[in-house]
């Protein structure tokens, strides 16, 4: 994480707070996750050199950049954002900082990104009512998916696909913005 300058991924007015361990507003009623939460999610995912990673909820691209460092030059991070302005800003920041192995897409993240599936790892940075089936379907076997689940009281769930079986582990309570879309919350 020390190779990713968090202050570059937040609006100018909150840059003085960039290194506090707290979520920060990035506009459009969205936030950048606290550094400790990014670390917890990355640790649960166990991203390896060469992994193909899907992220749902790009925001301004900070978490994608951290995962790109973990995946290394031979890995790739595909990240999906539903808000055009955030996707555009993320593309700009990631490009300026040289994160060439991160590809930003504008679409409904609850449907995943089947074009490049299957993925070794999937990270979801917004809370869903349940784990969206398209994401499980796009997960490689073996593979890992981490997602916050719940409306008011959320749990960070690690979903592992191993030998055709799905194993789910509760990693603890969290607080995320809602995941909106076909397989997420509607009209939140």
Curated annotation (Swiss-Prot):
Family matches, as Pfam families: PCMT
Entry EC no(s): 2.1.1.77
Active site: 33
Catalytic activity entry: [protein]-L-isoaspartate + S-adenosyl-L-methionine = [protein]-L-isoaspartate alpha-methyl ester + S-adenosyl-L-homocysteine
SS bond list: none
Main location: cytoplasm
HAMAP family: PIMT
Family the UniProt entry places it in: Belongs to the methyltransferase superfamily. L-isoaspartyl/D-aspartyl protein methyltransferase family.
PANTHER family per UniProt: PROTEIN-L-ISOASPARTATE O-METHYLTRANSFERASE (PTHR11579), PROTEIN-L-ISOASPARTATE(D-ASPARTATE) O-METHYLTRANSFERASE (PTHR11579:SF0)
Record-given protein name: Protein-L-isoaspartate O-methyltransferase
Provenance organism: Methanocella arvoryzae (strain DSM 22066 / NBRC 105507 / MRE50)
Organismal lineage: Archaea, Methanobacteriati, Methanobacteriota, Stenosarchaea group, Methanomicrobia
Name of the encoding gene: pcm
């Amino acid at each position: 994480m020390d190779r990713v300058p968090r202050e570059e991924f937040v609006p100018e007015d909150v840059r003085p707070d960039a290194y506090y361990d707290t979520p920060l507003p990035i506009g459009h009623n969205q936030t950048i996750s606290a550094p400790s939460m990014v670390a917890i999610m990355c640790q649960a995912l166990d991203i390896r050199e060469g992994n193909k990673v899907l992220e749902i909820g790009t925001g301004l691209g900070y978490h994608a950049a951290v995962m790109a460092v973990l995946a290394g030059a031979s890995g790739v991070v595909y990240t999906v954002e539903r808000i055009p302005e955030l996707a555009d800003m993320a593309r700009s920041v990631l490009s300026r900082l040289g994160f060439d192995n991160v590809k930003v897409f504008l679409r409904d993240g609850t449907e995943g990104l089947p074009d490049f599936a299957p993925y070794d790892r999937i990270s979801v940075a917004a809370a869903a009512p349940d784990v969206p089936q398209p994401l499980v379907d796009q997960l490689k076997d073996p593979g890992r998916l981490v997602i916050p689940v719940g409306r008011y009281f959320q749990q960070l769930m690690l979903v592992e696909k191993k030998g055709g079986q799905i194993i789910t582990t509760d990693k603890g309570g969290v607080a995320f913005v809602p995941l909106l879309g076909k397989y997420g919350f509607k009209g939140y």
